[in-house]
């Protein structure tokens, strides 16, 4: 596994809130969340869509970015969502 292939993603949940996470394989991680086997939050509030907000980084940098995104307000996360890269399943 390449050390620089980690991504930070946002998931739009059915309650219109955002869930933030990191993964070296966001498509696979979305499948896990959608199957109800991911984070507790996405088991309760099902994923609707996912977008990549940052990519091509090592795990440590991705973790720092994730923490920064989680500290954003809902409005700031919405703005980040609008600017983020759409997943192929969303086009």
UniProtKB/Swiss-Prot annotation:
Belongs to the UPF0213 family. This is UPF0213 protein NGO_1598. SUPFAM superfamilies: GIY-YIG endonuclease. It comes from the Bacteria. InterPro entries: GIY-YIG_endonuc (IPR000305), GIY-YIG_endonuc_sf (IPR035901), UPF0213_domain (IPR050190). Residues 4-83 form the GIY-YIG domain. The lineage of its organism: Bacteria, Pseudomonadati, Pseudomonadota, Betaproteobacteria, Neisseriales.
